[in-house]
Regions:
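Catalytic-domain carbohydrate-binding cleft regions of carbohydrate-active enzymes
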Residues: 1-210
Length: 210
């Protein structure tokens, strides 16, 4: 930013890289870049990012759904710089995790602690309408990730994740690959859940999918 003589008081909004195959659908280069993009929010004053988890295309690096990108960037500017209220909050991002038996329960930022009448809560939405949440993986101490079952705890905006193959889970990932069509979690205000991982395992041992 300093290289371009960026004015620190000027708002700066940017877009999450959209899902695409890149070097391969199941490889992890994209979510690692997304991690860096969200870390940058803490380093860039007056910044915001528009999520695109739901807008990717496996064969086109420039996805066609530009309207949603423009709207999400506009929501950031209208809320932060013009004081407009009643707009969708930024996309939910992973905050914390706790264990409950053989399940891991996740909490998120950018959502109210209690959803009022289902507003600002999680939903899973696919081509045919509402469906079960997908795109989650879970691992134990062996660091081997398995497809996971996820359930919404609607009234406190948490997500519960488990797998019969992982009796002692320690880590969860969501949409943590270059292209993950199963990732379908949104808010009722139309914002997609941002890809995340709860682990901080070394990047040269980033896990396998079985």
């Amino acid at each position: 930013m300093k290289l371009y003589h960026f004015e620190e008081k000027k708002p700066f909004y940017y877009t999450q890289l959209a899902p695409y195959r890149y070097e391969g659908d199941t490889l992890r280069s994209l979510p690692l870049v997304i991690e860096a993009q969200y870390r940058a929010l803490a380093e860039i004053p007056h910044s915001g990012i528009a999520a695109t988890t739901d807008l990717g295309n496996p064969t086109c690096i420039h996805p066609a759904r530009k309207r949603e990108v423009g709207e999400r960037l506009a929501f950031l500017a209208l809320a932060n710089d013009y004081g407009v209220t009643g707009l969708p909050a930024p996309a939910p991002v992973y905050k914390s995790m706790e264990r409950d038996g053989n399940k891991l329960v996740l909490t998120f930022d950018n959502l109210p602690v209690r959803a009022q009448n289902g507003v600002d809560s999680f939903v899973a939405f696919g081509p045919e309408g509402y469906c079960r949440p997908g795109g989650f993986e879970i691992a134990g101490e062996d660091r081997v990730f398995h497809p996971a079952v996820a359930n919404f705890k609607y009234w406190d905006n948490r997500i519960e994740v488990s797998s019969d193959r992982v009796p002692d889970p320690v880590a969860v990932r969501y949409a943590f690959r270059n292209y993950c069509p199963e990732a379908n979690v949104m808010t009722t205000m139309g914002q997609p859940l941002v890809p995340f991982r709860t682990d901080d395992w070394p990047l040269d041992d980033i896990g396998r999918i079985r």
